[in-house]
Amino acid sequence: MKAARFVMRSASSLGNAGLVPREVELFSRYSPSPLSMKQLLDFGSENACERTSFSFLRQELPVRLANILKEIDILPEHLVNTPSVQLVKSWYIQSLMDLVEFHEKSPEDQKVLSDFVDTLVKVRNRHHNVVPTMAQGILEYKDNCTVDPVTNQNLQYFLDRFYMNRISTRMLMNQHILIFSDSKTGNPSHIGSIDPNCDVVAVVEDAFECAKMLCDQYYLTSPELKLTQVNGKFPGQPIHIVYVPSHLHHMLFELFKNAMRATVEHQENRPFLTPVEATVVLGKEDLTIKISDRGGGVPLRITDRLFSYTYSTAPTPVMDNSRNAPLAGFGYGLPISRLYAKYFQGDLNLYSMSGYGTDAIIYLKALSSESIEKLPVFNKSAFKHYQMSSEADDWCIPSKEPKNLSKEKLAV
């Protein structure tokens, strides 16, 4: 926490000097530049130029940070002033200023390039606990203020954009660090964090085993996996795409974990558990992965809440004074997983049959040229979204009890 307080004091002093608002304002005038998976691969190819990547990132990363900082500033005042949100904001400001220092430096200087990698590592480590810290800020705000439906909707809108922004900046930093760092710690068959020949079924099986181990530890039992794969693009061949295995693993682990929990709890009195089914299909345009369980499903009224950042079936975690903030219990598993899917123009949806089970479907682009970053931009449309006020519903809302027409007097 001492380090965090130092960062906050540093950011505050910069702000008082008038530097931070000017830099944030300057870079927020630019729109982020989304990259395709193919472009990210080109940045890391054998002929990759570190100077080109450096020149792009020293401009692009401040633009992405500044855009989301502008959105933080138009959140409700009581939320922005919570200690946790102030801490997150200070991290972003400090990181932006660290990156801006490279704007006047020459990409021809090898020491500058080396220092830039070190700075990216420092920024990435500084932002390690952004997700749970922002989540704690939301809890602090809700504990002290009444949140109306419109504000709640705006928070959902903001958090989707905030966390998508974080996924994107982390992706760019990881690519540069893994490719150009002196310590080659990445997988030699990968280009940065991207696998040009990602074995989708292998990732599915690995994510299942990780979730199964967790389920066995907690429940002392777990369902098996029934896997089906269909390659509609190249029949008979293994299913491979260009993708980030860690992103896919994150999504699948979350879905398998939920499916196993539902199955074990719903079928606790049965002699055996029905398997969790995974179906992987590669088409000409899309890769689709369906995870199906017989865990009893959820009612329709709850389905939409499952993607809300404020809904969780786990106990709310207790934050301590360390930076190792917990994430389980904040209700972020599914919404963050959906963002990972959407990041490269995919999606993640749930279809549940209450009393039977749930199908969770991940959609990904099959072509790397169509897998393009989905990025938030702060503009007039985004600003107007936060200014929306509550309006009367233009659909009739039924009362809890139907009107007893027999007691109504007929008009003469």
Swiss-Prot record:
Q: What does the entry say induces or represses the expression of this protein? A: Up-regulated by exercise, starvation, glucocorticoids, thyroid hormone and epinephrine. Down-regulated by insulin.
Where it sits in the cell: the answer is: Mitochondrion matrix
> Which superkingdom?
Eukaryota
Q: Which SMART domains match?
A: HATPase_c
Domain annotation Histidine kinase: ranges: 138-368
Kindly give the CDD domains that the UniProt entry links to this protein. HATPase_PDK-like
Which Gene3D superfamilies does the record associate with it?
Alpha-ketoacid/pyruvate dehydrogenase kinase, N-terminal domain (1.20.140.20), Histidine kinase-like ATPase, C-terminal domain (3.30.565.10)
One GO BP on record is:
pyruvate decarboxylation to acetyl-CoA
Which residues are involved in binding ATP? 254-261, 293, 312-313, 329-334
Q: Name one GO cellular component term.
A: mitochondrial matrix
Tell me, what is one Gene Ontology molecular-function annotation carried by this entry? pyruvate dehydrogenase (acetyl-transferring) kinase activity
- Catalytic activity, reaction form: L-seryl-[pyruvate dehydrogenase E1 alpha subunit] + ATP = O-phospho-L-seryl-[pyruvate dehydrogenase E1 alpha subunit] + ADP + H(+)
Marked site, Interaction with the other subunit in the homodimer, at: Y157, R161, W395
Family, per entry = Belongs to the PDK/BCKDK protein kinase family.
- Complexes and interactors: Homodimer. Interacts with the pyruvate dehydrogenase complex subunit DLAT, and is part of the multimeric pyruvate dehydrogenase complex that contains multiple copies of pyruvate dehydrogenase (E1), dihydrolipoamide acetyltransferase (DLAT, E2) and lipoamide dehydrogenase (DLD, E3).
Q: What is this protein called?
A: [Pyruvate dehydrogenase (acetyl-transferring)] kinase isozyme 4, mitochondrial
UniProt source species: Rattus norvegicus
As recorded in Swiss-Prot or TrEMBL, the protein's gene is named Pdk4
